[in-house]
A protein has these predicted regions:
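NAD(P)H dinucleotide-binding glycine-rich loop of Rossmann-like/cofactor-binding domains
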Residues: 89-167
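Glycine-rich cofactor phosphate-binding loops and adjacent beta1-alpha1 units
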Residues: 156, 200-278
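C-terminal hydrophobic helical "lid"/dimerization subdomain
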Residues: 196, 243-247, 286, 290-339
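Mid-domain Rossmann-like dinucleotide-binding core that forms the NAD(H)/NADP(H) cofactor-binding site
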Residues: 135-215
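Glycine-rich beta-strand-centered segment in the early N-terminal region that forms part
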Residues: 20-34, 47-93, 132-134
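N-terminal Rossmann-fold cofactor-binding loop
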Residues: 192-194, 235, 283
Length: 339
């Protein structure tokens, strides 16, 4: 089989590898589609502190089960599945309180263990979630990105009365917009970014108001409209955002931080306790695959609005470079396998 392998930072090859055999409790998936994420680019460029090399990247992938290991029901052969990349121990404190996404021995497919940019992948059977026949392949491969939004909203518990402010109109910000509007019916969703084309994508995903904070002050604009956000989500991950969010937030608001930054954030603690703000963080997903599959079945979200480009996996270098360089026109890039 062919696999996309990062041998070391900035060295990507398509390598011939032996076809894997599923062990006990595992299934082998014949990959049909995979999605490119920022973390794939970070591993390729050597900017992911968790990655080990060489590594088959890819943690957003969909395919068909073509072999099962010992202890797995043979009825699963032929199932269309989306794969949850989060593998946890099930016994540590985080796992015991429903947070396998921060398991003390966490393994993420495509980061700590070989992932889905390959013609075949072996994964734990419990991580391969069946996809209903009426959900198209292109939507099935988008389950994992939407689980990020499901995890964020699971933390923040949005209501229809919320006024939500999202920093960042990249893929993670846009899936969150769709969840807030389509699933939770939040009355007002505001999206802030510095790229007008991304803000247009946010509009298409349901944002009520978009704002380019590279051109004028967000604080002044909100004050002029008399808006105090009750839910603020940082999907841009810049160290300056947290303090601004604390300043802009309504009393009793919730703030959710996504992504990673190793840069320090300067905050004034009085602003948090004075308003009794709740600050959450969100990493990966905690058992959110069935949640998102249900959203798709009910037509509450539309992945089609985020997919802008599709490449055969042989052109993966071109696909990643487009994803990295064309933030104006490019949002979600898919790779095809086994077509």
């Amino acid at each position: 089989m062919k696999s996309v392998v990062i041998q070391q930072p900035n060295e990507l090859v398509i390598e011939e590898r032996q076809l894997p055999v599923p062990g006990a409790g595992d299934v082998r998936v014949s990959i049909k589609l995979a999605g490119i994420c920022g973390s794939d680019s970070h591993i390729y460029r050597g900017h992911n502190p968790f990655a080990k090399y060489p590594r088959v990247i890819g943690h957003e992938f969909f395919g068909v089960i073509d072999a099962v290991g010992e202890g797995v029901d043979s009825a699963r052969l032929g199932q269309r599945v989306s794969v949850d990349p989060v593998i946890s121990c099930g016994h540590c404190y985080p796992c015991s309180v429903g947070k396998p996404n921060v398991c003390t021995s966490l393994v993420v497919l495509g980061v700590h263990r070989d992932g889905g940019f390959s013609e075949y992948a072996v994964v734990p059977a419990q991580n391969a979630w069946p996809i209903p026949d009426d959900i198209p392949d292109k939507h099935a491969v988008m389950v994992e990105p939407f689980t990020i939004a499901a995890n964020v909203t699971g933390q923040a518990k949005p209501t229809e009365q919320d006024v939500a402010l999202i920093y960042g109109a990249g893929p993670m910000g846009l899936v969150t917009v769709q969840a807030l509007k389509g699933v939770y019916q939040v009355k007002q969703v505001i999206v802030v970014d510095r790229i007008d084309e991304r803000l247009a994508m946010a509009r298409r995903s349901g944002a009520d108001w978009v704002f380019n904070n590279g051109e004028q002050s967000l604080q002044a604009a909100l004050e002029e409209k008399g808006i105090k956000p009750t839910l603020i989500i940082d999907a841009a991950c810049h160290p300056s955002i947290l303090q601004e969010a604390i300043t802009l937030a309504s009393p009793a608001a919730r703030i959710v931080l996504m992504g990673f930054s190793n840069e320090p954030s300067q905050i004034v603690q009085q602003g948090i306790t004075g308003k009794e703000l709740a600050i959450f963080s969100s990493r990966l997903n905690a058992n959110k695959f069935p949640v998102v599959i249900d959203w798709l079945k009910r037509g509450l979200i539309d992945p089609e609005k985020l997919i802008t480009h599709t490449f055969d996996y042989h052109h993966v270098k071109d696909a990643i470079e487009l994803f990295e360089k064309d933030q104006r026109q490019c949002c979600k890039v898919l790779l095809t396998f086994g077509q």
